[in-house]
Amino acid sequence: MRKYIKIGVAGPVGAGKTALIERLTREIACKYSVAVITNDIYTQEDAEFLTKNSLLPPERIMGVETGGCPHTAIREDASMNLEAVDEMVARFPEVELIFIESGGDNLSATFSPDLADVTIFVIDVAQGEKIPRKGGPGITRSDLLVINKTDLAPFVGADLSVMERDARRMRNGQPFIFTNLMKNENLDGVIGWIEKYALLKNIEDPASLVR
């Protein structure tokens, strides 16, 4: 019986996927056995960033060079990532959480159900308040939508109440959360969601979750 949960993290370039994983691992690595697999087209830049900045030892972080469309590597042909998962589990049989970060992609990114048990999709306020209502599978079908960089709203003319209204409509009852990862704002809500809906802990919904 498999004992670990695979969490897929996707979203456009620069939205905060790597930052989210870095902040999460800092907070939860003391409670759970965690590993990370990153995807980049031609480099291992995200893996190198996490190695330098997260609290995880380097052997718990693995970079996959997809050499092509990042969407394909997490959906149509996830074989490289599945092999990376197998290797990570062989290294750490006690692992409980494996984060799999997609390379930067558009709003249509989705994970193969063989690769991810639950999915988090990250967008950011700097892309404009219209982003939630543009839809796409990442926004409408992910298990959790993270709307990051709330601190930038005044500088880009984004109304967070409009983004909340549109996200409610597009998500149709599925949870989402606003974050400012630079200051760890609502990071505890993301952790609470992971514990309740990925690890199936018997806890209350985090107060910062919106439906």
Curated annotation (Swiss-Prot):
Binding site for GTP: G11, P12, V13, G14, A15, G16, K17, T18
Main location: cytoplasm
Keywords attached to this entry: Chaperone, Cytoplasm, GTP-binding, Nickel insertion, Nucleotide-binding
Record localization: Cytoplasm
InterPro entries: CobW/HypB/UreG_nucleotide-bd, P-loop_NTPase, UreG
GO molecular function: GTP binding; GTPase activity; nickel cation binding
GO biological process, any: urea catabolic process
Pfam families: cobW
Annotated GO CC locations: cytoplasm
Function: Facilitates the functional incorporation of the urease nickel metallocenter. This process requires GTP hydrolysis, probably effectuated by UreG.
Subunit structure: Homodimer. UreD, UreF and UreG form a complex that acts as a GTP-hydrolysis-dependent molecular chaperone, activating the urease apoprotein by helping to assemble the nickel containing metallocenter of UreC. The UreE protein probably delivers the nickel.
Family of this protein: Belongs to the SIMIBI class G3E GTPase family. UreG subfamily.
Descriptive protein name: Urease accessory protein UreG
